[in-house]
């Protein structure tokens, strides 16, 4: 059983990726524009120390990050690291932090987890990965081939866009609202796709797929290399 977790390059300095490796986890670094850790196609984690949590709320980064996290991933997670009681020591406006966490849960459907320290964070990430990569939740994904009858043009458009790698129903709707038509999505640049997708790698993958000529050779090679959508990350 090999657990793989994608980590943002900026997380190297935290030391958590090394702790994950000590737990037997394969860590793959990438430039993530949304989230700090990607567990599966649908699950991602934004890690914040207590200090960073407080600062991000007051400098307006918090809700932008949480909003993008919930738009890109079906199961977004905020992991708060450190003693939550320290918030009262850091700021007199601690109620604003509590309200932000409540809003993240209720308004953005973000799950909020807590860890004592970096070592505990690594343990929490491992447990999340075990649940979603190998546990009962592994099969809890939307299958593109088990949908109800498509009765409208909008349904068909969503169906087509959802077939792109790492694009679920929420992100498919976001792409269509941003670009208007499937043709415009196909004509978009990598930078334009990245802004909508929240990931440079995903944008490059979709851009390549849309512009690569179909051939039996490509199909055979891809079937040997790729076993799941997670491999496209």
UniProtKB/Swiss-Prot annotation:
GO terms for biological process: DNA recombination; DNA repair. A structure-specific endonuclease, cleaves 5' of ds/ssDNA interfaces in 3' flap structures, although it also cuts bubble, Y-DNA structures and mobile and immobile Holliday junctions. Cuts preferentially after pyrimidines, may continue to progressively cleave substrate upstream of the initial cleavage, at least in vitro. May be involved in nucleotide excision repair. GO terms for molecular function: ATP binding; DNA binding; endonuclease activity. This is 3'-flap repair endonuclease Xpf. Pfam families: ERCC4. InterPro entries: DNA_repair_endonuclease, ERCC4_domain, Restrct_endonuc-II-like, RuvA_2-like. Its cofactor is Mg(2+). Residues 8-127 form the ERCC4 domain. The gene is xpf. Nuclease function requires interaction with the PCNA heterotrimer. Inhibited by SSB, even in the presence of PCNA. Keywords: ATP-binding, DNA damage, DNA recombination, DNA repair, DNA-binding, Endonuclease, Hydrolase, Nuclease, Nucleotide-binding. Changing residue 52 to A: Loss of nuclease activity. Interacts with PCNA heterotrimer via PCNA1 and PCNA3. The keyword Metal-binding does not apply. It comes from the Archaea.
């Amino acid at each position: 059983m090999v657990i793989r977790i994608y980590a943002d390059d900026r997380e190297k300095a935290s030391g958590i990726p090394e702790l994950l490796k000590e737990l037997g986890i394969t860590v793959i670094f990438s430039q993530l524009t949304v989230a700090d850790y990607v567990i599966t196609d649908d699950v991602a984690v934004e890690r914040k120390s207590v200090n960073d949590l407080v600062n991000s709320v007051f400098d307006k980064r918090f809700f932008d990050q949480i909003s993008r996290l919930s738009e890109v991933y079906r199961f977004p997670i905020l992991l708060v690291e450190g003693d939550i009681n320290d918030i009262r020591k850091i700021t007199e406006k601690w109620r604003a932090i509590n309200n932000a966490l409540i809003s993240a849960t209720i308004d953005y459907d973000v799950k909020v987890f807590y860890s004592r320290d970096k070592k505990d964070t690594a343990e929490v990430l491992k447990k999340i990965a075990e649940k979603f990569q190998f546990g009962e939740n592994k099969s809890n994904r939307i299958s593109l081939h088990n949908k109800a009858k498509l009765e409208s043009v909008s349904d068909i458009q969503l169906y087509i866009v959802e077939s792109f790698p790492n694009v679920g129903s929420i992100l498919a709707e976001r792409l269509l609202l941003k670009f208007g038509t499937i043709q415009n999505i196909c004509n978009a640049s990598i930078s334009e796709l990245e802004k909508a997708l929240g990931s440079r790698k995903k944008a490059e993958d979709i851009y390549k797929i849309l512009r690569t000529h179909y051939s039996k050779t490509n199909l055979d090679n891809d079937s040997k290399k790729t076993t799941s959508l997670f491999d496209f990350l």
